[in-house]
Amino acid sequence: MKKPLIKKLDNAWANKVKEYGMCESCHKTTYLNAHHFYSRSIRVVRWDVPNGFCLCVGCHVFSSKFSAHKTPAEFVEWAIEKRGLDWYEALKERKNSMVKFIDADYDDLIDKINKEIV
């Protein structure tokens, strides 16, 4: 797949996740980031909006008390508590599915991302 298309999908996904409008942890409304629950290296869920969390930069990266990157075990526990076990199981099942994308699928993904309700 071509890099410009990947970048376009990444931007569409991040913008959709940030439409939530505030940090899902501390409720700040500035310096928002889109965080992947499952790594972006797992393409089957890389652009799934439910795989994203809207976090302020502190909760995403910098805080030593709660940070998706500095305290990942606590983040996973918090995410499951926030979104529920059904969300977690459905996303995990999708992550473990064997899907191979072709270039035409990526164009459809942008439409799917844009239609998601946050």
For each of these PLM feature ranges, what is it?
Residues 39, 62-66, 96-97:
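Short histidine/acidic/glycine/proline-rich micro-motifs that form metal-
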Residues 29, 40, 78, 94:
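Short acidic/histidine-centered micro-motifs embedded in hydrophobic/aromatic stretches
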Residues 1-9, 117-118:
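Arg/Lys-rich, low-complexity, intrinsically disordered N-terminal tails that contact nucleic acids
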Residues 87-118:
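Short flanking/linker segments adjacent to small metal-binding domains or redox-active Cys/His motifs
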Residues 31, 52-84:
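Short Cys/His-centered divalent metal-binding micro-motifs
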Residues 8-33, 56:
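Short cysteine-rich loop/turn motifs with clustered Cys
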